[in-house]
Structures are given as C-alpha cells and as structure tokens.
Amino acid sequence: MASKDFHIVAETGIHARPATLLVQTASKFASDITLDYKGKAVNLKSIMGVMSLGVGQGADVTITAEGADADDAIAAINETMTKEGLA
C-alpha cells in the first residue's frame, strides 16, 4: 500500500479536465486507487466519483493505492498533479 497527501493549489480545483487526466492516469494501473476528501473516499478510476467530491482550491486530499503496482501508481499520479499545476 502507498499513499500521498496533496494540497490543491489550482484556482479551479479538480474540475473536469484535470479530473479526467487523473482518472486516465489511475486507470493504467491494476491497484485499487482511492481519493479521500473530507471523510469521503471514491475510486480514482471513476470520473463521476471524483467530480462528485467537488474538490476546490485549498483542499487537502489523500490518494491511496493498494496492489502490486501501488508505488508506481502514486508516482504517476504525483507527476500528473505536478504537471497540471494541481498540487
């Protein structure tokens, strides 16, 4: 299991475009990957789940991956978050 905390700095938070990129990144891995925000956990491979959280600027989220490729998944998600200016 691997996890990482992120502080969302993007003005628009995790809106449709970056949410889609995060879901696409997570979907490349076999691990179960969740996004935790305000006590709610959703499957990071589900665009509807991610969008339903309404993660805005200044939010603190935790992404957790469980499975054989968990470390690689967290590294790829971290890269996407940084590249897109989300965290």
Swiss-Prot record:
Keywords: Cytoplasm, Phosphoprotein, Phosphotransferase system, Sugar transport, Transcription, Transcription regulation, Transport
Residue positions of the active site: H15 (pros-phosphohistidine intermediate)
Residue positions where Phosphoserine is found in the record: S46
Domain HPr, chain residue ranges per copy: 2-87
Top-rank taxon, per record: Bacteria
Annotated localization: Cytoplasm
Family: Belongs to the HPr family.
Role summary: General (non sugar-specific) component of the phosphoenolpyruvate-dependent sugar phosphotransferase system (sugar PTS). This major carbohydrate active-transport system catalyzes the phosphorylation of incoming sugar substrates concomitantly with their translocation across the cell membrane. The phosphoryl group from phosphoenolpyruvate (PEP) is transferred to the phosphoryl carrier protein HPr by enzyme I. Phospho-HPr then transfers it to the PTS EIIA domain. P-Ser-HPr interacts with the catabolite control protein A (CcpA), forming a complex that binds to DNA at the catabolite response elements cre, operator sites preceding a large number of catabolite-regulated genes. Thus, P-Ser-HPr is a corepressor in carbon catabolite repression (CCR), a mechanism that allows bacteria to coordinate and optimize the utilization of available carbon sources. P-Ser-HPr also plays a role in inducer exclusion, in which it probably interacts with several non-PTS permeases and inhibits their transport activity.
The protein, known as: Phosphocarrier protein HPr
Species for this entry: Streptococcus mutans serotype c (strain ATCC 700610 / UA159)
Name of the encoding gene: ptsH
